[in-house]
């Protein structure tokens, strides 16, 4: 099984790269490392397909310091209607369908250097762009 990135995850990453061409990518990622493989993580390939349903986007988008929070918040709001999004984690908070996409404390890894975005199986083959104002959509 060869791991591959969800089409929706790939589309969103491309949109972010286009909107922020000079952004820092040091904390970007999608495929889990050995630390992830021992845990339940959307960075691990799903069996039997091999799809990876998560991306990390570095919080330094190359512009105003609050751009990452703005992006995370727009993703949170979009999650209310776009069922391709499973959850968003950023800066010690998580938003998901639990509590209808309201931010709540996250007690796992703090995610202060990057935004974690997980996708549902609905996004596996869906290449539609995400309608986010910060990305010019």
Show where each model-derived region lies.
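Secreted/periplasmic proteins that engage bacterial cell-wall peptidoglycan
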Residues: 1-100, 112-119
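Low-complexity, Gly/Ser/Thr/Pro-rich intrinsically disordered linker/tail segments
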Residues: 3, 121-137
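Intrinsically disordered, low-complexity N-terminal regions enriched in serine/proline/glycine
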Residues: 86-89, 105, 129
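Short amphipathic beta-strand/extended segments with alternating polar/hydrophobic composition
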Residues: 97-102, 129-131
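Short proline/glycine-enriched turn/loop segments at secondary-structure junctions
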Residues: 103-109
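Secondary-structure transition/turn motif
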Residues: 105, 119-121
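Short glycine/proline-enriched turn or capping motifs at secondary-structure junctions
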Residues: 109-113, 126
């Amino acid at each position: 099984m060869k791991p591959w990135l969800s089409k929706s995850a790939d589309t969103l990453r491309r949109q972010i790269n286009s909107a922020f061409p000079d952004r820092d990518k040091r904390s970007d990622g999608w495929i889990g490392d050995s630390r992830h493989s021992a845990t339940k993580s959307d960075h691990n390939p799903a069996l039997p397909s091999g799809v990876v349903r998560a991306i990390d986007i570095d919080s330094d988008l190359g512009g105003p310091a609050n751009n990452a929070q703005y992006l995370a918040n727009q993703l949170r709001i979009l999650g209310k209607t776009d069922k391709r999004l499973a959850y968003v984690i950023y800066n010690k908070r998580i938003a998901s369908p639990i509590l209808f996409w309201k931010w709540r404390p996250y007690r796992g890894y703090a995610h202060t250097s990057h935004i974690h975005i997980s996708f549902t199986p609905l996004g596996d083959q869906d290449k539609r762009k995400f309608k986010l104002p910060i990305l010019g959509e």
